[in-house]
Amino acid sequence: MRKILFLVVFLGLGLAQSEGAKVYSANCQTCHQANGQGLPGAFPPLTHLDKVVQAKGGRAYLIRVVLYGLQGPLTVGGKTFNGVMPPFRQLKDREVAAVLNHVLAVFAKSKAKPFTPEEVKAQRARAFSPQKALKSRPPVK
């Protein structure tokens, strides 16, 4: 009986979603899809973000994207996307950090240090438009 109880608890914990996964599912998945591959011609994939986060200014840029959205042409993997990503300023600082950590770990397979709520708070204190957020994107190869 004890083994069965342990197995049920263990499996239940394994199925529990992280906060980042929950935020992604509720706010990002519709456009970027459950697998982070996006929709061709409409919404870019998120699998390349390790290159972005490693670039100078990349961490701040990714936070700005979530907080302020994006508007204007964006080239990812040789393909241009020209849509609008809405801002998600309603998310708490810890939720923004969690969703970025989820995306980087799961889709980009990044080993970048985790984002913190303090980093998000620092970017939230600055005013950016979706167009200005896009212009702050670091060059990536």
Model-derived regions: residue spans:
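Positively charged n-region of N-terminal signal peptides that target proteins for export
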Residues: M1-I4
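The canonical Cys-X-X-Cys-His
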Residues: Y24-A34, M85, V99-H102
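Electrostatic cytochrome c docking/interface patches
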Residues: F10-Y24, G38-L39, D50-Q54, L134-K135
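Flexible coil segments in periplasmic/lumen-exposed cytochrome c-class electron-transfer proteins
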Residues: V76-G77, G83, F88-K141
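Gly/Gly-Pro-rich "capping" loops immediately C-terminal to redox-active cysteine motifs
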Residues: G38-T75, N82-L91
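Stable alpha-helical elements in mature extracytoplasmic
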Residues: E19-Y24, G58, L62, E95-V96, ...
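Solvent-exposed, acidic/flexible segments
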Residues: Q17, L39, R59, K92-V96, ...
